[in-house]
Amino acid sequence: MAVPPSAPQPRASFHLRRHTPCPQCSWGMEEKAAASAGCREPPGPPRAAAVAYFGISVDPDDILPGALRLIQELRPHWKPEQVRTKRFTDGITNKLVACYVEEDMQDCVLVRVYGERTELLVDRENEVRNFQLLRAHGCAPRLYCTFQNGLCYEYMQGVALGPEHIREPRLFRLIALEMAKIHTIHANGSLPKPTLWHKMYNYFTLVKNEINPSLSADVPKVEVLEQELAWLKEHLSQLESPVVFCHNDLLCKNIIYDSIKGHVRFIDYEYAGYNYQAFDIGNHFNEFAGSHRSPASASHVAGTRGTRIGDSFLATLLEPQETAYVSPGI
């Protein structure tokens, strides 16, 4: 597979506005070496405050005993025999259980246990910084503590959306407004470089030695993949998409709709960080289309109505950014 030649890029109907000069990625051999050595992501904003830490390890195959030990620390006034639990099974890599006493779950602690070896893909310290940053701007629940292999945080009231919901105009506009709010969170000091290329090089380093040379000829060789990655970086860095704070993983189940308060909030900040604004938008649209299992549904999304939804989403997302500035809420 040859590296594709350069081609002029067509003008999009919506231009992602850059409000401040954006430093382009300039990965050199030192940065590639840093990624291959397992270095953490470029640092984001500093933590707002210290987070409680408990030296407790929760068995991912038997989560309840460890979760209840943490609840004794976080809610000492709760009687152990009265604590109720509810497991969530939508997660792909992590284990999640809710602990509460009252039926309405108004005071509910979520205990999340990291998936095995996910630290190879996720910078957990950076995740905590993201959590605190978003909380400070009114976009995340309270983070109660971290422990050896996970964290505890406030349960967010509402329902996780499905693919049948995010096409509704009222809801996709709420999603666009929440995305716009997050995108206007300003970095302290100079704007960080996009996290995209660091992650791509890091992922590539993790898998390059695991590719079986006996695989089909349809699977590109490592050298070809490396060339394509360099080509992508060279050309995508020239598109002048603004670098903003992004969620970077906006699949349906990471969007919570609160019908009482009339808003949506995003959850799971493992991959959040400063990145190209266009990536966050495209990632959400990709999850949107990828949620449909049947060819009929896929063509429905790709058709005229899908185009109208995309245009309306972008109009809602980009319009507030002319004047909006998000300041910390606490």
Give residue spans per PLM region:
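Juxta-kinase regulatory segment immediately upstream of eukaryotic protein kinase catalytic domains
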Residues: 2-86
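Helical subdomain adjoining the active site within ATP-dependent kinase catalytic cores
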Residues: 3, 217, 323-330
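Amphipathic alpha-helical protein-protein interaction segments
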Residues: 56-60, 120, 218, 303-307
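An amphipathic alpha-helix signature
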Residues: 64, 68, 197-204, 208, ...
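ATP-binding pocket architecture of kinase catalytic cores
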Residues: 86-231, 235-245, 260-261
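Catalytic-loop of the protein kinase fold
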Residues: 245-247, 252
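Catalytic activation segment of kinase domains across protein kinase-like and atypical kinase folds
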Residues: 253-292
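Active-site activation/catalytic loop segments of kinase-like enzymes and analogous catalytic loops
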Residues: 278-326
